[in-house]
Swiss-Prot record:
Keywords: Ribonucleoprotein, Ribosomal protein, RNA-binding, rRNA-binding. The lineage of its organism: Bacteria, Bacillati, Actinomycetota, Actinomycetes, Mycobacteriales. Residues 91-157 form the S4 RNA-binding domain. This is Small ribosomal subunit protein uS4. One of the primary rRNA binding proteins, it binds directly to 16S rRNA where it nucleates assembly of the body of the 30S subunit. With S5 and S12 plays an important role in translational accuracy.
Length: 201
C-alpha cells in the first residue's frame, strides 16, 4: 500500500508538531523549513483546518483517500464525528503496536506489522491498517520474540506510558485490547473539530 516515506522531521516542522515522538531535530528547529521558515504567515480559517487534517494524516501515516474513508465512516457512526474519527485511527494495528510500546515510532510499528511479526487472535496479520476490536489479543510471533526490535522493547518497557485501554502482558509481550479508546484517553495534539469543519463544507 502507498504511504508517505519522506523526511518526517520536515513534515513535523511544516505542521508545527512532532509527528515522530521524541524528534530532537524538530525540538531544535520547531518552525517551518526553508529560507522564510520563521516568517509569520497569515492564517485563514481554511488553512488552519487543512493544517489540522494534515497533522492527523501524518501522525497516523494515512494517505488522503483512506483518511477520507475513515472520516465518512466516522460521520455515519452515532456520537461525535471527531471522536469517532480518532477512535478509528487509534484502532489501527500499527498504532496499537506503537501505543503498547513495542515500537519507538508509528512508522517502525507499521514496518513490524508489514513484516508479519504479529498475530491477532491467533491469526497472522500483516496489514498495518487492520482494525482491532475490544477483547482482541495481539501476540508477537514465536520466531520474532528474540529479534532485536522486541528484545529492545522488553529492555525499555516502562519508558513510555501505555494507555489504560491496552495492557501488555509478560515477556511474550502479549497485547490485550480492553476497550477502544474514549477521547480523553487519546493524547494527540489535535483539534479534531477543525477536521470535521473542513470536510463539512
Amino acid at each position: 500500500m502507498a504511504r508517505y516515506t519522506g523526511p518526517a522531521t520536515r513534515k513535523s516542522r511544516r505542521l508545527g508538531v512532532d509527528l515522530v515522538g521524541g524528534d530532537q531535530s524538530f525540538e531544535k528547529r520547531p518552525y517551518p523549513p526553508g529560507q522564510h521558515g520563521r516568517a509569520r504567515i497569515k492564517e485563514s480559517e481554511y488553512r488552519t483546518q487543512l493544517q489540522e487534517k494534515q497533522k492527523a494524516r501524518f501522525t497516523y501515516g494515512v494517505l488522503e483517500k483512506q483518511f477520507r474513508r475513515y472520516y465518512d465512516e466516522a460521520n455515519r457512526q452515532p456520537g461525535k464525528t471527531g471522536d469517532n474519527l480518532l477512535r478509528i485511527l487509534e484502532s489501527r494495528l500499527d498504532n496499537v503496536v506503537y501505543r503498547a510500546g513495542l515500537a519507538r515510532t508509528r512508522r517502525m510499528a507499521r514496518q513490524l506489522v508489514s513484516h508479519g511479526h504479529f498475530t491477532v487472535n491467533g491469526v497472522k496479520v500483516d496489514i498495518p491498517s487492520y482494525r482491532v476490536s475490544q477483547y482482541d489479543i495481539i501476540d508477537v510471533r514465536e520466531k520474532s520474540l528474540n529479534t532485536d526490535p522486541f528484545v529492545i522493547a522488553r529492555e525499555t518497557a516502562g519508558d513510555r506510558p501505555i494507555p489504560s485501554w491496552l495492557q501488555v502482558v509478560g515477556e511474550r509481550q502479549r497485547i490485550l485490547v480492553h476497550q477502544l479508546p474514549e477521547r480523553a484517553q487519546i493524547d494527540v495534539p489535535l483539534t479534531e473539530q477543525l477536521i470535521v469543519e473542513l470536510y463539512s463544507k
